[in-house]
């Protein structure tokens, strides 16, 4: 399977603790037999926007459609994630809008993890913000896929037991849940938008001529809800 790590560090790779943990995570995926690419965003010439822009970042965004999982990696800066990861969220906004307009969520069969490097407060807030955004984008968030590394410097990072264990948890759980999603293909039966062809199966919405069935006639939305044991 394929995984992408977006490194949102503000420092050069040679000086970045975040990049060091990214490389550890990349190695963990590779040891499990999967491919993993680390994209250092500060090295790209990209535009801050909420629209589809042709620049250095776009090809990496497009790779997300073929990937099985994505990791957002960031240091803690003033209690929150870096400007590069914020820019990535903003650049994904056009996909979010497209998904709503076309009633199809392209990231439903994909998993997401987060990686936060830093010794100060803020990691829980960062995980929460990124998970909220990822959920709205359609990603599935497996358990214990939130890496928090307080270690400083590559040598300390490599030998820090907490960092090593969290990296292992993240890589193993992301690949496990990605495989489950790949085999189960929830995209097929999941609800993709505010109006969806599967709504009659979910017991919501108004039954029309287009989605009526022999068991649920036109106007029979209340009966459909009762049949599923749901309250009106």
Regions found by a protein language model. Name each.
Residues 18, 51, 122, 127, ...:
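Surface-exposed beta-strand edges and their flanking turn/coil or helix-capping segments
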Residues 3-10, 23, 38, 42, ...:
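Ligand-binding pocket scaffold of soluble enzyme catalytic domains
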């Amino acid at each position: 399977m394929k995984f992408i790590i977006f490194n949102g560090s503000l420092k050069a790779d040679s000086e970045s603790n975040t990049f060091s943990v990214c490389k550890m995570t990349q190695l963990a995926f590779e040891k499990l037999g999967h491919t993993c690419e680390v994209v250092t965003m500060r090295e790209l010439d990209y535009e801050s926007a909420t629209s589809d822009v042709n620049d250095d970042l776009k090809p990496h965004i497009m790779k997300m459609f073929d990937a099985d999982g994505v990791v957002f990696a960031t240091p803690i800066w003033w209690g929150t994630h870096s400007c590069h990861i914020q820019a990535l969220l903003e650049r994904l906004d056009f996909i979010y809008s497209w998904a709503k307009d076309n009633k199809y969520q392209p990231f439903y069969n994909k998993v997401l993890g987060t990686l936060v490097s830093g010794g100060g407060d803020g990691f829980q807030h960062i995980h929460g913000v990124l998970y909220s955004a990822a959920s709205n984008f359609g990603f599935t968030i497996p358990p214990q896929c939130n890496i928090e590394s307080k270690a400083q410097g590559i040598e300390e990072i490599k030998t820090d037991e907490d960092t090593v264990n969290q990296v292992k948890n993240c890589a193993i759980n992301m690949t496990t849940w990605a495989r489950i999603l790949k085999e189960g293909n929830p995209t097929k039966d999941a609800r993709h938008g505010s109006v969806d062809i599967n709504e009659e199966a979910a017991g919501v919405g108004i039954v029309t001529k287009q989605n009526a069935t022999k068991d649920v006639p036109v106007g029979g939305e209340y009966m459909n809800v009762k049949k599923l044991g749901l309250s009106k």
